[in-house]
């Protein structure tokens, strides 16, 4: 994939980052080809999450265009539109008005094409790797849980600030992978280091665009805790299989209900 135009648009050295991204993609393919990852997962959840994010953003562009905002919606949608599409503001929207669904909908709402593009690039790169490692039910649970831990830290850090984006969950995936693969010792060292490089890349990008560091930290801590607690042994994974199927169904249902509830507010 040609990453150069994307990084050039951010004022970064596109040629250098193109080389880095190509090298990381090659390393990831080598890791999976050499059998470091177990087989057996269909990887469906990652791409479903990607599709939901893209569809939700497309709906926002259409709604913003219909409201007369034009192309500004594509690159920098205004705050009211972000709130209409589930942006999170703890005070007053959640704590006073009880709009609890925003604790999940914010993670599917993005403040422009660059914001969406970055989060989807990272999800596309690391999501299939983690889903293949731990299975779809655990992956869905992890993704949803870290969206919640990301926004919960924001409650204490900046309760009155509008927050949007999947980066809390993305950092959650990275935090999980670093902790989980670190527990594997030398067998997981290459994958742990791969994820650490992604963490550095994500942090630098977030610093450049002034992203929500509280959400990043909350997601990463939630993911790391998940990675430290999740059983590594086959026996432990089998013992918890039913639990995570139930949790995944609950997570998916909560996400669908939250997005549906947000859509319902458009007609009130």
Model-assigned labels for residue ranges:
Residues 2-268:
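A detector for small-residue-rich transmembrane helices and their helix-helix packing motifs
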